Amino acid sequence: LINSIKKQDYPQDLITIFVVADNCTDNTAQIAREKGAICYEHHNPDERTKGFALKYLFEQIQRDYGITSFEGYFIFDSDNLLKKDYISRMNDSFDAGEKIITSYRATKNFSENWIASTYALHWLRSIRTRHRARSFLHLATNIQGTGFLFASEIVKDGWKYTSLTEDRALTADCVVEGYEISYNDEAIFYDEQPVSLKVALRQRLRWSKGHLQAFAESGWGLFKNIFIDTHTQRYDDDKWYNYTWRTIRHRFMSFDTFAQLLPKNIINIFRWIIVYLILYPFFCSQFGLDNIRILYNSTWLAHGITHIFGDITVSLPAGAETYVL
């Protein structure tokens, strides 16, 4: 990663490389320093997420340099590689006024096995259906862990996102504050994907937990913004229709991000319990059933069973004694 940064076509005297060696027991810190990076070592077994490492890093930057002494910050994972013009492309968006920008995530090990390939397709789907579409409409896309740039003003008070998915928390908080998260399709970096099913499942579980944490932290703020927008800035020379368009866009960005974080599966589980295990048995005990189909062709399994055996129906007379849950 450090070598690929040093090979950028962007002026090297304008780049400062910080590395946080998070609970490392190898010679990561030594190698980083030998390569010319400023390395901070973080040792705390109770703080093992990436968010805590970044929190510690920005605390050290604030102490030694001042966070706002730099215009912006890139976030990368240690296994990332950058295309030669990556920083220049991202800087073009930054100079155009964008405050937080994500980029094109390519896969280093696409052909290693089927797990890496499916991850690569997952990120490609995200690029095609999430980043490009939202960026075209000037809405907020979402940060995905690595390969993004943000203005120092966003973390002027330090890094506060320490949940399991700090990227989702950052996304939600920035949208709440009225920032448009843009996407640069020409800035390409390469990321290594998991090749172990165990690692992939553990990562997915971490993502699921992190999404719930991000919703708990920022869900209410996003929901309020849908109806009461207090963060869209109004300029002195603003035409009324320009401000109206920006506030409508911010409300829709809040709704979009809220919908992405909303734990729909958990809500569906509670709905299933209330409707099918409580209300429906009560209805049946009071009014009975008359030739009600058990299976509907909503799944391939149900379709196959009904194709072989035909419609399976049930009839029950009314009365609590004839219908027992």
Across the structure, where does each feature detected by a protein language model lie?
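Short, acidic, metal-binding catalytic loop of nucleotide-sugar glycosyltransferases
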Residues: N3-L14
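Acidic donor-binding loop at a coil-to-helix junction in glycosyltransferase catalytic cores
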Residues: L164-L170
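Short aromatic/hydrophobic "clamp" motif used to bind/position activated sugar donors
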Residues: Y73
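Catalytic donor-sugar/metal-binding loop of nucleotide-sugar-dependent glycosyltransferases
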Residues: H138, T171-Y190
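The conserved acidic donor/metal-binding loop of glycosyltransferases
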Residues: D77-L81, C174
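Long helical/loop segments within the catalytic core of UDP-sugar-dependent glycosyltransferases
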Residues: E41-G66, F70, K84-S163, V175, ...
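Membrane-embedded multi-pass helical conduit in multi-pass membrane proteins
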Residues: Q260-L325
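A conserved acidic beta->alpha catalytic loop
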Residues: A21-A29, N44-D46, L81
